[in-house]
């Protein structure tokens, strides 16, 4: 997947997950125990390392399924000199961060 294809997915919005991957995250644990993502990196499908700065956390919601406990963050980010809205998910039991990009 090229960076242009990633931006096509990001800018189109939608409900169907087109691309998801685990990411290396730098985050802050606040005094109240809440997490705040700061920046992350990931390898795209072409194995190119992409670095992303989190500019602002717009929303955070708790996700609870039968065996899954996670927090989903909607963030304003900067990648490749562009501001992009992204969803990040933190899985509590595995301590893993994931990035989700969507398309209609």
Q: Language-model segments: what does each one mean?
A:
Residues 1-104:
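Cysteine-centric segments in proteins
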């Amino acid at each position: 997947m090229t960076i242009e294809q990633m931006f096509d997915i990001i800018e189109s919005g939608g409900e169907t997950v087109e691309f998801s991957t685990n990411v290396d995250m730098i985050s802050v644990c606040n005094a109240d125990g809440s997490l705040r993502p700061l920046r992350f990196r990931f390898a795209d499908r072409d194995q190119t390392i992409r670095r992303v700065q989190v500019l602002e956390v717009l929303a955070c919601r708790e996700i609870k399924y039968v065996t899954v406990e996670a927090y989903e963050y909607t963030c304003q980010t900067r990648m490749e000199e562009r501001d992009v809205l992204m969803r990040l998910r933190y899985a509590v039991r595995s301590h893993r961060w994931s990035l989700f990009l969507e398309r209609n």
